[in-house]
Swiss-Prot record:
Subunit structure and binding partners: Heterotetramer of two alpha and two beta chains arranged as a dimer of alpha/beta heterodimers.
Family the UniProt entry places it in: Belongs to the prokaryotic AdoMetDC family. Type 1 subfamily.
Molecular function in Gene Ontology: adenosylmethionine decarboxylase activity
Active site (UniProt): S63 (schiff-base intermediate with substrate), H68 (proton acceptor), C83 (proton donor)
UniProt xrefs under InterPro entries: AdoMetDC_C, AdoMetDC_fam_prok, AdoMetDC_N, S-AdoMet_deCO2ase_core, S-AdoMet_deCOase_pro-enz
UniProt protein name: S-adenosylmethionine decarboxylase proenzyme
PTM statement from Swiss-Prot or TrEMBL: Is synthesized initially as an inactive proenzyme. Formation of the active enzyme involves a self-maturation process in which the active site pyruvoyl group is generated from an internal serine residue via an autocatalytic post-translational modification. Two non-identical subunits are generated from the proenzyme in this reaction, and the pyruvate is formed at the N-terminus of the alpha chain, which is derived from the carboxyl end of the proenzyme.
Pfam families attached to this UniProt entry: AdoMet_dc
Entry annotated with the keyword S-adenosyl-L-methionine: yes
Gene3D superfamilies noted in UniProt: 3.30.160.750, S-adenosylmethionine decarboxylase domain
Function: Catalyzes the decarboxylation of S-adenosylmethionine to S-adenosylmethioninamine (dcAdoMet), the propylamine donor required for the synthesis of the polyamines spermine and spermidine from the diamine putrescine.
Catalytic activity: S-adenosyl-L-methionine + H(+) = S-adenosyl 3-(methylsulfanyl)propylamine + CO2
Protein's organism: Thermodesulfovibrio yellowstonii (strain ATCC 51303 / DSM 11347 / YP87)
Keywords attached to this entry: Autocatalytic cleavage, Decarboxylase, Lyase, Polyamine biosynthesis, Pyruvate, S-adenosyl-L-methionine, Schiff base, Spermidine biosynthesis, Zymogen
Amino acid sequence: MYALGTHLLIELKNCNPEILKDLESVKNILVDAAKKANATIISVNFHEFNPFGISGVVVIAESHLTIHTWPEYGFAAVDVFTCGETIKPEIAAQYIIEAFECKVPSIVEMKRGIISHRNEKLPHKVCHEELQVVY
């Protein structure tokens, strides 16, 4: 089945807590992951909580990468959602796992936007004039 996007739900257990609590490190890891996956970065926004924990998003032309960290548990929840054929979400995921020194990662892959009942390949972006119902 063809889908509009691929969504990787990544659980990172037993990570290096020093990395998970460092705002610049977390931000750089997600930005670098987007670049390594061949994504086009649109904007970056991260927030550091008191006493610890970071949430952030890297908005890409092809969708987004998000993270929420719990350094006190050595845990992070990461989403890598991508659309189109030029971006490689699995490359981003592998880089993130390695960069956080994660010892127990797990990844669930979901295909998003399975809207064609004819199992036909769908274009990633279409012009407004080209929009049509595909089912």
